[in-house]
Amino acid sequence: MRVGVSESEDSDGHVIEDEDLEMARQIENERKEKRAQKLKEKREREGKPPPKKRPAKKRKASSSEEDDDDEEESPRKSSKKSRKRAKSESESDESDEEEDRKKSKSKKKVDQKKKEKSKKKRTTSSSEDEDSDEEREQKSKKKSKKTKKQTSSESSEESEEERKVKKSKKNKEKSVKKRAETSEESDEDEKPSKKSKKGLKKKAKSESESESEDEKEVKKSKKKSKKVVKKESESEDEAPEKKKTEKRKRSKTSSEESSESEKSDEEEEEKESSPKPKKKKPLAVKKLSSDEESEESDVEVLPQKKKRGAVTLISDSEDEKDQKSESEASDVEEKVSKKKAKKQESSESGSDSSEGSITVNRKSKKKEKPEKKKKGIIMDSSKLQKETIDAERAEKERRKRLEKKQKEFNGIVLEEGEDLTEMLTGTSSQRKLKSVVLDPDSSTVDEESKKPVEVHNSLVRILKPHQAHGIQFMYDCACESLDRLDTEGSGGILAHCMGLGKTLQVITFLHTVLMHEKIGEKCKRVLVVVPKNVIINWFKEFQKWLVDNDEELDTIDVNELDSYKTIEDRRRALKAWHSSKTPSVMIIGYDLFRILTVEDDPKKKKPKNRNRRLEKAKEDFRKYLQNPGPDMVVCDEAHKLKNDDSALSKCMVKILTKRRICLTGTPLQNNLMEYHCMVNFVKPGLLGTKTEFANRFVNIINRGRTKDASPLEVSFMKRRCHVLYDHLKKCVDRKDYRVLTEAIPPKQEYVINVRQTERQCALYNAFLNDIVGDSGLSKRLLPDYHMFSRIWTHPYQLVLHEQRMERERVMREDAEEEADFIDDGDGSESESEGSFKSGSESDSGKSVVLSSDDEGSSKKKKNGNKPEIKKTAPQKKRKFLNSDDEDEEDGEDTAMAILQDGIRQSKRLAGEEADLRDTDTPPEYTGWFARLGLVKEEDRDDFALSNKLILLVEIIKKCEEIGDKLLVFSQSLESLTLIKRMLEYMAGTGQWFADGHEALNAEGEETWSWLEGEDYMTIDGSVQSGKRDAVQTSFNDPLNLRARLMLISTRAGSLGTNMVAANRVIIFDACWNPSHDTQSLFRVYRFGQTKPVYIYRFIAQGTMEERIYKRQVTKESTSMRVVDEAQIQRHYLGNDLTELYQFTPSTFDPDVEISCAPPKDRLLADVIHKNQHAVVDYIEHDTLFANVEDEKLTEQEMKDAWTDYEKDKSGMPVRAQYAAPPMPGFPNGMIVGQNVQALLQNRMNQGIRVDQMQHDILFKELQKMRIKDAGTAVKIVLLRNLLEQILPYIPDEMRGGMSEFNTHFIRLVHETDRKMETPADLLRKSLESFKTVIKMVKMIPTCREPLARMTRDYPYLFA
């Protein structure tokens, strides 16, 4: 089996290799060794004795000393009882003297035993005629019990007679083999055993002829007695068959030749097996006798389930050993009979003692027997489902067609010539597009009749190159070519980073395909499913880019369903859209789509208050939205489809069309299985089932992505990541924010570890000791998390929460009393249409609460009964963090993450009480802090008790001073309410401007305060979508300078909103799901941003929040590995979840300075310097996820990941330590070089003073470099100023969209600092940029005069 592109048709679509299977086995062996070593160390630490070795291993060793061949050919494992008896037997058979004594003793009693056995037989047969079946079973049970007692008290010896009984059993087994040999069911694997059966039979005959007369008689008597025992243990339905068998066998009295008895046995068994299946015989054991007999002894190998059975040594013994053998057969008989069919296929010949024969038989048996799945072994392609194989083959064929098309045609054409931007950057990323042709219509022969799929010129001029490639990707996925319009098409994921213009790409793509003559016939109706809070934004974007851009583009009917409030209105709107003859687009929210199409669960009782009008209209809704539904569907923020078991995903997959386009900026959220759900929506079966995907990718990547992974696991992970990335590269188009760095100012992210105050530490420890207990892990993780979050936010939050809970409890009791007094009926028929409005998507399904842990009406009653849920109360599932969630699945992110990672759950997490809040505060939590006296009423307005609030206030004041707008994201509405109250309190008491700072943008004598709607704005779940758009527009208004702060709930405002007016973001608390925080920061870092962006993440140091952030780091690393194929440093250990409850605060020592260098952000540096008691340290977030070049696979290694010819080399990346190299030409920071005095004089003539430079943005960035030089900074600022002077004289068509040079030089500064280059390198790059521009514009007439002036003032720059 080969991987990747293979010439063989059989290997199409294969992504797993044979060498990978071997590597997986090696990893599993390493993991087993590690587990054994850890267990041993744990026992040593606890003082426990080492575990005793199993006797089976000793038996194996002893048998190997006696006979190596017998050890290799040991019989299969029997029942546990047989093994226990075999243990005692094998311990006393070592010495030769005992064996001689046993032989002599057994010969004396041969005749006596023969008489006793015949007597027992007659007694048993007579009792069968007289007694009933029930009495017969009771006797057999008593006899077996008696036999067991006797064998347990006997010594561990075995007689010569029992060995002969084993030989008779072996002869029977040979007859079975002979019969199986002639059957039609035999396959190729049994051929070796067939060839050996004749030899085995001949050898058995020769051995039987050499037996003495006494041995033959003993064998005959043993055989008869054994059959009697079997007959007694048989069930009623098998008794007649056994009687018939025993009569036939007893009639055979001749014992002269054992071959004769063998033939008769064979004939009898064939007769018995013809009408009905043969009863399976008990498991046999290996025979070992005296030295001369052991050479001729036969070995019988029987099938096993798991491992080789223990080697059983049998020697001469007393008379009781015969009874023991009989009882063993009786015990095993019933179990073995259930598997008789299996034995007929896998049983083997046991007379050949050669090693080769046994080996062949074992191999053939392993092939015949279905293997149990082993942990850590990758699935072979033969184990995959047919759907998976077909999907992989179809995708491979599509990729071949696309590669051929790309070689023959490239429809994305850039304008000829070079503009200013391209000359400076050295790339074509900023060059304007000349034309974008998606399909040349090559199938049409007539040139005049060809209708290429081409983007309209009015749209081409506003597109960027990466957006043109995204449009081409969507066309290749949904349509592929005009020749394949009759096929069902397929889908793809446009996984462009937030801010790269995915909405514009979709609008351009839809306009292009809908207005095409051929495609428009097949695709007229498009459904765009988006989050509720961006419905209006999408509608406005269609108007902006189509209607407002060019009247010729206004050819598509665009409508949104949210504006229709009643069921009937929505039905009419969908009917008009579905039956439209012109191209039309319908925009709908995820929640409304689910409500209109969800099917009732037949297992659940229908609610009495359900909307009957909606139930009647659902049939039409499903027709319009699902089957036949739209011709194409577009899903924005498609990571909402992360759980294929959710109601939303179940509704979405029922859409009939396969032309599905998914948009997401964060394709990977909590785990790889969520990624699988999204890919499976657009490409069903491509990644296989969940089990197949987990086996082939998830398990391997998860093992190797942590720092405690072995080198082999890391190597295997890298290979799997590359295979997964390459496997999906034609259906997932990923572009990260590096595209933004070439077009907008840079971004800096900082993680600030905030120190806990003494009061917070005392409360945290008290809660750990008194409430959580000594177990270390509470059974109520989510309630504990919320309690901790209140502590690290502000201690008084505990009191406010309890007060709100008490108020709600009283209101709930009053409502229950009123409900008991007034009977309103079920309300099923009286429900008005007006109740089913757009608010039903979220407002009627949720109650707006202040935080996720607000219990509301879902508190548990004391009697244990489920509380009645009011109409306005949430339905069954409530939100985890706040009421801002846009669908019911988002609220379960945390709970699902904890469940998947093995954290202990309470009953409420396990879903036993699904109608109750997952985050209900347990009764023992109520008022626990009041007993300690750590929280007082006067703490309400003491905001110094929280260092997070102190840092927040300082950053807001600094932003006021420099004129920057700020966004504050929090996942808890409690925190947002606290921030509001703090700002209003400080403004009302005159504390805000008491420190003397001034707002830069305050006009004249205008006094700013903190009034909602004027000074700050809020977006949370209670703000309707229409109002959100108005708030966003007002905040982004460049003339509205007073609105300088926006408070946003993480989930309500992190999706799809545009806040480019702000350039600083504070993420107040870390979220379990990293995608929410990532979405938040990209509200400001997107196209349209004109200032450098600064992100500050507040993390409560030493707390559970710090551990949550570490989980985010691991998840983002996985996302970049799989989606971007970036090799990221493996972050933290794999067992971090077990450390969630550890509290390791850092105490403040005023004599010890903060252990970190000043950040490049001057604002943050000032804040940290002023508040060192509040900050432990900081880290740059982007540095954690910088692409580690050392871990990248080379081109050859990428091939090896597919062909598996050799293993990858692994190694931990080592970050280069900072060491400033000597800078020749710049000693002691002084400017040295040609015409230095002239440079200084010209600088003075232009009025450039040092005090003015201190406020220059470029100069500030130069001073933040880790390797900096003042002289070089002055030179670079001068070059920038000269280019700014000549820019107005450059024609607009040559600028390439460049309006200033500041951004270009700042990008050079950051690039140089990131690569740890010297200031000399930066100066060289700056001079190259300067000369490039001068060379480009020197022939332009308008530029001649300013260039002549520069030449006179700075001749050395033009030399």
UniProtKB/Swiss-Prot annotation:
It catalyses: ATP + H2O = ADP + phosphate + H(+). It is found in: Nucleus. The lineage of its organism: Eukaryota, Metazoa, Ecdysozoa, Nematoda, Chromadorea. Residues 1-402, 809-891 are annotated as: Disordered. GO terms for cellular component: nucleus. Required for embryonic development and gonadogenesis. Also, functions redundantly with the transcriptional repressor lin-35 to regulate somatic gonad development. This is Transcriptional regulator ATRX homolog. Residues 951-1134 form the Helicase C-terminal domain. Residues 347-357, 833-847 have a biased composition (Low complexity). SUPFAM superfamilies: P-loop containing nucleoside triphosphate hydrolases. Keywords: ATP-binding, DNA damage, DNA repair, DNA-binding, Helicase, Hydrolase, Nucleotide-binding, Nucleus. InterPro entries: ARIP4-like (IPR044574), Helicase_ATP-bd (IPR014001), Helicase_C-like (IPR001650), P-loop_NTPase (IPR027417), SNF2-like_sf (IPR038718), SNF2/RAD54-like_C (IPR049730), SNF2_N (IPR000330). It holds the Pfam family SNF2-rel_dom. GO terms for molecular function: ATP binding; ATP hydrolysis activity; ATP-dependent chromatin remodeler activity; DNA binding; helicase activity; transcription coregulator activity.
